[in-house]
A protein has these predicted regions:
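S-adenosylmethionine
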Residues: 118-121, 125, 129-204
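Class I S-adenosyl-L-methionine
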Residues: 1-97
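Conserved S-adenosyl-L-methionine
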Residues: 57-145
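Proteins with a high burden of low-complexity, intrinsically disordered sequence enriched in S/T/G/P/A and R
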Residues: 1-12, 28, 107, 116, ...
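Aromatic-enriched hydrophobic runs in primary sequence
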Residues: 32-41, 49, 53, 87, ...
């Protein structure tokens, strides 16, 4: 194990406390994002604005789902949030539209792990991808959440391999490194200035 016995015991106490909190809150709410609230409270002390991380308020998430919803319940669809944060927008959708496959994406590993935990305890079925959603080839990590929940009733998490990610999205492995290198080269290239700004000639 990576941690010592005393540390593992502390983590188990945290897990038990989180489960008890969720059981209490979900008696009066449809969903509850404890991790997102804690993360924003800690981030507001200093680094939140610098990192550009602002999670959508809970009531706004509910309002967005209600505004885009219809009387007809959708099932068997893939619903995606390319900047999931702690996954609260997908949670708001899930409680009103059960039976869909949720896909959460974020560049932050911390956000992805919060989403994994939230999807697990709320009974969501789907996957969480850590990458820049504008660069889908740049896969960093991924998790399948509750892949066997509908057949066994057991909540589980399974790591996603890079091959599984690319196969599901039809992203070929050949030429990937070359394209990423070309992108990085263009990104690091100096910006050329127009001739009118670089010329040293003066008008007499």
């Amino acid at each position: 194990w990576k941690y010592k016995r005393q540390q593992n015991r502390f983590f188990m106490e945290l897990l038990a406390g989180w489960i008890q909190l969720m059981q209490r809150e979900l008696q009066t709410r449809e969903w509850f994002d404890a991790f997102g609230d804690l993360f924003m409270a800690l981030s507001s002390r200093g680094g939140q604005q610098a990192h550009g991380q602002f999670f959508t308020p809970v009531h706004i998430c509910d309002l967005m789902v209600q505004c885009t919803g219809t009387d007809e319940k959708t099932t068997g669809k893939r619903m995606n949030d390319p900047t999931c944060g702690s996954g609260r927008l997908l949670l708001a959708y899930h409680v009103r539209n059960l039976g869909n496959y949720l896909v959460a994406e974020d560049i932050s590993r911390t956000c992805c792990l919060m989403t994994v935990c939230n999807m697990l305890i709320h009974g969501c079925v789907g996957e969480v991808i850590q990458h820049d959603s504008l660069l889908p080839e740049d896969f960093k990590d991924g998790w399948f959440v509750n892949p066997v929940l509908t057949t066994t009733g057991i909540p589980t998490i399974r790591k996603m391999s890079e091959d599984e990610y690319r196969t599901s999205r039809n992203i070929p492995l050949s030429g990937l490194k070359q394209r990423m290198a070309q992108f990085q080269k263009r990104k690091d290239a100096p910006v050329s200035r127009p001739a009118c700004l670089t010329s040293k000639k003066t008008i007499s």
